[in-house]
Every structure is written in structure tokens, then in C-alpha cells.
Amino acid sequence: MALKDTSIPEPSGPVPGTTAPALSPEDRGRLLAGAHHDPHALLGAHPVPGGIVFRALRPFARSVSVVIDGQRTALASEGDGLFSGVLPLAAIPAYTLHVAYDGGEQEVHDPYRFLPALGELDLHLIREGRHEQLWQALGAQPMTHEGVPGTRFTVWAPNAQGVRVATDFTYWDGTQFPMRSLGASGVWELFLPGVGEGTAYKFEIHSRYGHRFLKADPMARRCEEPPNTASIVTASHYEWGDAEWMAHRADTPVHEAP
């Protein structure tokens, strides 16, 4: 007699999520006010008892879902543009966010799943005041980080309570893009995937006195024409043609050269 297969079939479709642990009132308040030093500790994906918690801050969105292997799982709204949920996973997976707005939908990489895009040597030299190429370490630098194209935003603001990136496509509201403090260096950093050349931006500074200011980037490679004051994401495409001269410049003693 043939044996009957009584095994339970593998479930198909997205894994259902559960309610995420609430943020503390202090963390939530500082995050929404733009005065949190480490938004990456609150947003993105993190292990918690029972799985992985996903949390996103998208103040203009109608809904946000986590996309894993092509399957969407909706996050619950916490109010104030925060969306969250816990998925029963053993480890943080590769994922994207599907964000629905009144005017359309988009699937994007989560800025808060990336490690810092500025190295320890840069931070050490900035902290000691000995960095000789600050224009490469600070400002808006288009790059590919962890395999994803985007732009690294960095600014030196040692006395700020918080810093956010405000752009033309967020209507100069920096709420959804708070930056993280990189310790005693005084540098704030955020990698924004998918943001490229031509994007207009400013830094939204939250001072220690509770005031907020929109500031142009002091290390900007390009700026708008007056009376507009925004900085513009720009990469250098200049190609030097002095390789032959550089190769032979040591052939002549410096005091004998013209």
C-alpha cells in the first residue's frame, strides 16, 4: 500500500508581520524633531525577540511595505510618518521598501540599512584637523556604496543636536532623512541610495538651543544661481592630462627648474 504524504506544504506569499515594540517617548520625540544623534539605531532593520523589526520614516507616504525576495509585507502606521512591523526571521535579509504616495508608488533601498560611507582614517584626520582633502571627505559625494549607487552626504557640525538632509524632492522638508553623528569627529553622515547628480539639497541643522536652520553645504561642488541658495550634487568629470609631466618632474632639481 502506498504511503500518503501528510507533510504540511510550505506556505506561499509574504510572511505576516506583527506589531513592533514602541519607541521610547524620548527617542520618538528627538527623531521627529530632527535632534537624534543616531537615527540608524531606530530606523532600518534590527533583531528583536521574535524576529526582525523594520521601521521607516516616510512622512508623506500612505503606506510602506518591506519587500523580500519579491514578496511585500505591509508595515503598520505608528503615526507621524513612522511605519513598523516585526517579521519572524532569524537574520536581517536583503530588502527594499515599497512606498505608496498619493501621486504614485516607488520601490527604494532603505538608507538606514547601510554602514557609514566615510572611513575611520578620514574621521581621524578630521578630528585632528589634519585632513588635506576635505572636499573629498565632506559634502555630497556620488558613489556606489555596498553595491548600490547613490550619494554620501557628510557635514562637519560638532555643536549640532541633529542634522537632516533636505532636498528639492522632499520639498525642503528634512524629516525623512535624519543623519547620524560619527562620534567625536563632529561629522554627520547619511548615504542616500538612488540620489544622483543634479539633486538640489541643503542641510537642516538643529542647534543646541532648539533652533532649526536650512544651510547650504560649505563643501558644495556646485550651487544654484542667486537668488536661490541650494547646493547641487555634482561629481567631478575632469580628466588631467599631465601624466607625462608628473612622471618626469623629479628629473630636474627644484632649484634649477624654470
What kind of feature is each model-predicted range?
Residues 1-49, 78-157, 180-258:
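The feature marks proteins involved in alpha-glucan
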